[in-house]
Regions:
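Domain-level recognition of nuclease-like catalytic cores that cleave nucleotide substrates
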Residues: 1, 237-256
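Structural signature of nuclease core domains in nucleic-acid processing machines
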Residues: 197, 224-226, 238, 248
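Switch/connector loops and helix/strand junctions flanking conserved nucleotide-binding motifs
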Residues: 136, 211-213, 241-245
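Short, charged, amphipathic alpha-helix that recurs within catalytic cores of restriction-modification
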Residues: 207, 212-228, 232
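Active-site ExK catalytic segment of metal-dependent nucleases
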Residues: 194, 201-209
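Amphipathic alpha-helical "lid/sensor" segments that cap RecA-like P-loop NTPase cores
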Residues: 2-44
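Short beta-strand/turn micro-motifs composed of small residues
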Residues: 182, 205, 235-236
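Accessory nucleic acid-recognition modules appended to NTPase machines
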Residues: 28-199
């Protein structure tokens, strides 16, 4: 995810406010305090929703684990790192990640895999389902501190991935057809939407302007075998759609 060329337009500042606010239904009411809501949400989650799944003495460690997961949204899952940060063993970290998935706090995005291309990662990526909760856990107290922070790109990617999956499901798609691409040479494509034997590559950029170089990595799909490469997209902060190449279009975040 690129983080260059961030635009200062009012639309894009509103976008960062939306990302920071999160998607919880109660927060659609602007009079509801963001900080108070998420403080109460986390407390209720730990005291009620999780208590039946972990022992009470582990609540503090589980909170640290929750924060560690937020700090890794948009990244490959590494159970050892999560376990270290929470002060638990790897087996516990794996179990707790399952708890977060089952309760809808995080999702794991599976990598694209093809028998024709063995050198692809099998490790999923971790995404929070609500960017507001991730911002709260990480102490990003305002949209501006988020936008200027070190994790802006990862949180932006988390938001876009969530919106793409929601839009795809609303259109009758199957979330199991949404992947990412990463191979042994660490070449990556943020999203792959698979429709039968056709792969649609999607890149996510925080910038408002993208060039052909931003999608040069899409060419790795030509080596996958048994698949065709369909129309691609770069989801970014442009105001209007425009062609990047003959087969790739820049798409505004607001339109997904």
């Amino acid at each position: 995810v690129g983080d260059d060329g961030r635009c200062e337009s009012s639309e894009n500042l509103d976008l960062w406010a939306t990302i920071h606010r999160g998607s919880m239904p109660r927060l659609m009411d602007p009079s509801v305090s963001w900080d108070a809501f998420y403080t109460g949400y986390v407390r209720t989650y730990l005291e009620r929703d999780v208590r039946d799944l972990i022992t009470v003495k582990d609540e503090a460690s589980f909170y640290h684990f929750l924060v560690a997961c937020a700090a890794r949204t948009g990244r490959l899952v590494n159970h050892s790192d999560l376990a270290r940060d929470a002060g638990v063993d790897t087996k516990t970290a794996q179990s707790w990640l399952s708890v977060l998935r089952a309760s809808g706090v995080v999702r794991l995005l599976r990598p694209f895999w093809s028998n024709a291309t063995k050198r692809l990662t099998k490790t999923p990526k971790l995404y929070f389902t609500d960017t507001g909760l991730a911002c709260h856990l990480l102490g990003w107290s305002s949209p501006e501190t988020l936008r200027r922070g070190a994790m802006a790109g990862h949180v932006f990617e988390t938001f876009v991935v969530g919106e793409v999956i929601k839009s795809y499901l609303n259109a009758g798609g199957d979330a199991r057809n949404v992947h990412f691409y990463r191979d042994a040479r660490q070449r990556e494509i943020d999203l792959i939407i698979q429709e039968g034997r056709v792969l649609h590559p999607v890149e996510i950029k925080t910038s408002a302007t993208v060039t052909r170089e931003a999608v040069a990595g899409f060419s790795v799909l030509n080596d996958v075998g048994d698949y065709d490469v369909g129309a691609g997209a770069v989801i970014c902060q442009t105001r209007e759609p425009y062609p990047v190449t003959a087969t790739v279009k820049a798409v505004p975040v607001w339109s997904i």
